[in-house]
Amino acid sequence: MAKKLTRKEKQINELYVETTLDIGKNADNWISFLKRAGYNYKYRFDEQVLIYAQKPDAIACAETKIWNKRLKRWINKGSKGIALITERNGELGLRFVFDLSDTNSNVYGRKFRLWKAEERYTNDIIEALENRFGTMEDKTNLSFAIMSTICNYVVDNIQDYLEELKLVCQNSKLQELSEEQLENIFLNLVTYSTIALTMSRCNLDVDRYLLKNNFDTIEKFNTFETMSILGTATRDFSREMLLEISKTIINIEKEEEKKNNTFEKLNKPIYNEEKTKGSVENGYDLHKEKQLSNTRLNNRKDNESENEIGQIRSNEIGIFETKQEGNIYDANREQPINRSL
């Protein structure tokens, strides 16, 4: 016999369905969601939706035990957790995560810094994307490189999602389309959506390259089932892009940190052994925080119950550490240009 849902579980499930339908009502709502979901790109689509519904400005979420044990950060008194849906053995439940803004740290806390796609990393990112996903049509800058990569990747990998979409088109505005129209609309919208989410997380100006009318067909995805497939495809494709970008940036920063540490050691004054011992005995162990900094969050493969250990991992943290046609906006020309995606 299935477990009866609690009032809170019913409330959160309803919130998930309502918010999923709401973000698909029009282009503005969908774009707004995409620009925030980039910060939670490792979470499943349903989790991204619930984070957006309860705390739209969240940038890094984890359960209390992760903040406490791994990051030595503490939940602020009175903070309200973000409820996410879990499923075990076919039964629904809830777990709660807290955003970085809901936490604080003492002297032993880890200094928290999300990765940033700074301009100095551009060439390395472009090279990594091309090595991972294949030759780009345009790599004039990081924005065009990301767009070219996503266009190729979505075309090559969208078929399974498209087949799922065809099974749930009934009772949606998509059912009035021919099969060819459905394929073109889905391919274009997933491509544009993946570009918007990925570029937003890289702090690139989406509005300079994509127009709002690129997302107008979102209104045809007017059922929970069709929106779920669109959202899942967008999340899956953007996640692959952002994992590669983040890995590249973190590797560069680790190498830079190694060089800095080596330089500091070479230039470090030699202290009297007795003075060093005395400082430790008096509670001024300058190496304590450095020992804590060796803690790293585990990377886990994506699965149905992926938790935030994979969401907030060491990679996110710094310590001292068929063709489709569409309009993409060219900022240099100050007008939309027709590009083959």
Regions found by a protein language model. Give the residues of each.
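N-terminal accessory/interface modules of nucleic-acid-binding and processing proteins
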Residues: 1-300, 304, 318-324, 329, ...
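Short cationic/low-complexity microdomains
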Residues: 308-312
